[in-house]
Design a protein with these regions (language model features):
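Flexible, active-site-adjacent loop/turn segments at secondary-structure boundaries
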Residues: 24, 28, 73, 132, ...
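Generic structural "secondary-structure junction" signal
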Residues: 32, 77-80, 136, 141
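A broadly used, surface-exposed interaction patch
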Residues: 35, 63-115
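Non-catalytic alpha-helical coupling and interface elements of nucleotide-dependent molecular machines
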Residues: 50-53, 93, 97, 127
């Protein structure tokens, strides 16, 4: 998916009915009526970093019908006087450990006559370490459109993303006779471990 940089991009997602997936999530609002919203935001963002990375868009309502639950319906702007970009950044940095490098928060004004009504876009890179939600002391990972607690092996797998074997393969193609086919002996003169 291309980076979302304008209201036109948002409208294109809605018009095309681009469904949520592992790398895209819609949130209709940021409910700050209780303190649970901080833990929920930390869970959503850390889960996406622990999976493949992706984008969370705050300010898009999905359809209520079960069969269309993950499809965007319409824009539901977030009021910046209630939740600012700085507040979101603070919640993320103080509730996820370690901090997610390369995370970006952007803000799109929905209607220029109402500058306090915005959509927040959080672009989350795939991480090379596991991120913990400090509110729950758990590690989460996004699977398609759901978020689950991670198993021990999944946490270890994420922490080893930067470790790759150094393998070089050399091939030689040549035409062989039928008789040579039965006598092929592999050579390993360039095998490095």
């Amino acid at each position: 998916m291309n980076k979302i940089t304008s209201i036109e991009d948002i409208n294109a997602l809605i018009t095309a009915g681009v469904e949520e997936c592992t790398t895209l999530e819609y949130k209709s609002d940021i409910n700050t009526s209780n303190d649970k919203w901080k833990g929920e935001m930390a869970k959503d963002i850390s889960a996406m970093a622990n999976a493949n990375g992706g984008t969370i868009i705050y300010g898009i309502k999905e359809f209520d019908e079960e069969y269309k639950r993950h499809i965007p319906s319409h824009i539901t702007p977030i009021d910046t006087t209630k939740v600012s970009k700085e507040t979101i950044a603070q919640v993320i940095s103080s509730n996820i450990s370690p901090k997610i490098k390369g995370l970006e928060i952007s803000c799109l004004v929905v209607d220029m006559t109402k500058p306090n009504e915005v959509i927040y876009i959080v672009d989350i890179p795939q991480s090379h370490t596991a991120h913990q939600n400090l509110k729950t002391k758990q590690y989460h990972k996004r699977y398609s459109t759901t978020i689950n607690s991670m198993e021990d092996y999944e946490i270890r797998d994420i922490m080893n993303r930067n470790i790759h074997p150094d393998i070089t393969l050399d091939f030689e193609f040549r035409q062989i006779t039928k008789q040579e086919l039965y006598c092929i002996q592999p050579t390993y003169n360039h095998l490095y471990v």
